[in-house]
Amino acid sequence: MRAIRTVAVNVFLESVRDRVLYNLVLFAVILIASSYLLGQLTAGQDVKIIKDLGLSAISVFGLFIAIFIGIGLVSKEVERRSIYALLSKPVSRSQFVTGKYIGLVLTLAVNVAVMVAALYLVLGYLSWRETAAFKLSWDAPGPDPRLMKAVFLTFLELMLVTALAVFFSTFSTPMLSAVLTFGLYLAGQFNADLKNFDKVVDSQVAVWLSRAAYHVLPDFSSFDVKTQVVHGLPVSPGYLASTAAYGLAYIVALVLAGTFIFSRRDFK
């Protein structure tokens, strides 16, 4: 565990020094703050627009961080030949990959926390500025604690994207890892549609392939509850628990697969 912790801390410290990371987070915070101005253009819908744009900004910029830092976590060490020095230390390859993943998850957690704080500050200001009579027209309060349900699932989604990026980086180039990770992310957004593919095609082979893809591809759409939260609709604890269990199981499988592949690579 000490070796994993050391690798994770090094990844975290290296990531927070990355200027690209600061630029992404700064741009996300500016976008969240700007949503207040956009909300003023739509009477009665301002709080919904701020919540929707804020949660979307957290998801999109978190995705950029997960992919563009995650794809180079392992391959960068191989390209710089620093992998030899790292593996000569008392660190196994499985500890190396696991530590890299945990380090990036810590980086994501800090940056998501910053963006969430910015969103709640904007919502808090809006709630303070508006009259009590006007706030009665809102479906949910401004700084609504239930927003954290959407943030929780969004963070799990980003953890899964990170696991994909780290998995691909154990055996492919950064460019290919980015393409594969982003491609699977997009495909996973439409995973639920594959379940009913037999209703739109007649080919039995296509139906079998779609069902296989449905069970293999990660269902990223299940992590998206922004619409329900923004409109004050309930998201049950059971749904949160089952989705979290699904995401964590997929993450563990990807990290284990990545460590298995990386442990068998020959760097000579």
List where the protein language model places each region.
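Aromatic- and glycine-rich beta-strand/loop motifs that create alpha-glucan
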Residues: M1-Y22
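Helix-capping/transition residues at the boundaries of transmembrane alpha-helices
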Residues: E14, S75, L86-S88, A165, ...
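Hydrophobic alpha-helical transmembrane segments of multi-pass membrane transport/permease proteins
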Residues: R19-Q40, S56-I67, S177-Q189
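Residue-level recognition of transmembrane alpha-helices
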Residues: L24-A28, K100-Y101, L108-A109, T181-F182, ...
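Secretory targeting signals
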Residues: I32-L73, V97-F171, F197-K199, S210-Y214, ...
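Alpha-helical transmembrane segments of multi-pass membrane transporters/translocases
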Residues: Y36, T227-K268
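Transmembrane helix boundary and interhelical loop/hinge segments in multi-pass membrane proteins
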Residues: I67-L87, V91-R93
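Helix-loop interface residues and adjacent transmembrane-helix termini in multi-pass membrane transporters
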Residues: E77, P90, F171-S172, R264
